[in-house]
């Protein structure tokens, strides 16, 4: 049997401690884990795809089986190109489940060979989102407990221009 390969897609604008928690836990389960950084055209990003990738590479440097790449198009197609058999999605609350279930069902329809794995976030991060981090930081709030230090510095630099 070959390597167990999975993809964790997201905009990660910016990556939070909640994202990192899911990545670290998935990295223990899968032999190879691709963090695919997406550019969501419906959102105005704070960071470029390249900046987000660099931050993710820094905070996952201790995980040798994690690879950070940018991706566009359908996640299920990207996963297939990488030889992945799984897409990992973090769930913060029941409210995330309905949306994620619809996406998982569509992905299953498009490619029945790729499973979606839902991972419940650590309860201490259940309220956390990139949008919330940006909102707090915009008003000079303290985000040190919400994001890795490299991200804290980068977010502060963006809002203190």
From Swiss-Prot:
UniProtKB keywords: ATP-binding, Coenzyme A biosynthesis, Cytoplasm, Magnesium, Nucleotide-binding, Nucleotidyltransferase, Transferase
Positions of ATP binding: 11-12, 19, 90-92, 100, 125-131
Subcellular location, principal: cytoplasm
Chemical reaction(s) catalysed: (R)-4'-phosphopantetheine + ATP + H(+) = 3'-dephospho-CoA + diphosphate
SUPFAM superfamilies named among the record's database cross-references: Nucleotidylyl transferase
Compartments, record wording: Cytoplasm
Assembly behavior: Homohexamer.
Protein name: Phosphopantetheine adenylyltransferase
Species of the source: Listeria innocua serovar 6a (strain ATCC BAA-680 / CLIP 11262)
